[in-house]
Amino acid sequence: MTNVSLCRCFYSIDLNQMRLDLHTHSIKSDDGRAKVENYCKWIQKKQLPLDGFVLTEHRQFDADSDYRELEDEYGLAIMKASEVETDFGHVLVFGVNEDLLAAIDFTDVRLPIEAVLDESRKTGAFAAPCHPGRKRVGLFAHYEDRGVVDGIDTVEVLNGGSIPGEDELSLNMAEQLGYRGFGGSDSHVVSRIGFCATDFPNQQILDMETLVDALYGGNFSPISMRPDAGN
């Protein structure tokens, strides 16, 4: 069962856990409008309780950008992943490496989800469907007609870009199917970063390797920090 936290305001960071926004987009994505440094400035200005964020650019892996100077300047973990498009909706892939890039064409908008899951697992990456309650591009939109996909145990249950009803569907279906759940803002503009995030209790996650280990470990929970979230 997925435990979900909701809060009305942003509070100070709990030193006993890491809080990461696992789903963000920068200007590297074709529909992104946010510069990475501006995300950092916004987090600092608004004192958002985030220890870092993951850039999940659409249909690509941004191997060239180096954000270590920004990490040092702002005290944030800034990691890079990908959002790919499959025949069962969009999937986030953490821990992208050369072997995975050789096995899968990230630019393909109809990747077989089984291939994404299998190749990610084989190469040490971690793949999980995002915004599964969304029409057309969400995992659960395909389950009624096509059945349940084997090999999925984790999905994004809180998404900062969701409209009413989508996250509720994600949470309900995840509970029914026994899936673990995480959260991400799906921000494409600076002001939406941190709307949803993921808490990792008693863990220090400072790079992609430790993030992938934590995702496989399963000790995490989603949190909504939308301005209109209830207590």
Language-model-detected regions and their locations in the chain:
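Short, hinge-like loop/turn segments at secondary-structure boundaries
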Residues: 71-73, 95-99, 145-148, 198-202
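A basic- and aromatic-enriched beta-loop-alpha substructure that forms the phosphate/nucleotide-
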Residues: 83-105
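Mid-to-C-terminal alpha-helical segments outside catalytic/metal-binding sites
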Residues: 2, 205-231
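Domain-core and long-helix interface of multi-subunit machines
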Residues: 6-9, 24-30, 64, 99-195, ...
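Alpha-helical scaffold elements within enzyme catalytic domains, especially in hydrolases
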Residues: 42-45, 69-70, 119, 126, ...
